[in-house]
Amino acid sequence: DIIEEFEISHLVRMLSELDTDDITYVLEICEEELRKEVLKNLPKELQKLIKKALTYDEDSAGRIMQTDYVSIPVSWNIGQVVDYLRTSKRVPDEFYALFAVDSRHIPVGTVPLHVAMRKKREVKISDIMTTNPKIVSVNDKREDIGFLFDQYELTSAPVVDARGRLIGMITAVSYTHLRAHETPI
């Protein structure tokens, strides 16, 4: 109810500062009319991402994933990664892992950020990545995602589409936040 008290322009500015999973969460609890008005006023790229997220089943990875993540070609070295992180406008505010992808954008490994930042520039990503990453499908249910995070103590997991291409990520922080809202006190 308090959300509906804000002017649309103010609400759009506030939401634009959030991660896509948080924007989706806020909009799904809004009245339909307000949701449409806010969506219409979001930047076009963000509008597209949120509309897509809202098409996924409410209980699926697609609904709770963040679409801001860092993917890097598996052929890169640490120097290329650092240069990319410094210059790219597409780097999320918070991330814990680099997702190494092949030429088809399929995740083939992960590198925790703290590991990557301690390596010399010439070290190849393929030499330090963990292969066979724990992958979440866009249609996986929340309970399956929870099992994966609990079982493997993940800090983040890549989310893939039906073709296996990387389209998002779920972080342990998002997963924990989600669990807190589902658990009765």
Segments predicted by a language model, with ranges:
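A short, hydrophobic C-terminal helix/tail in secreted or cell-surface proteins
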Residues: 180-185
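Hydrophobic packing positions in regular secondary-structure scaffolds
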Residues: 1-179
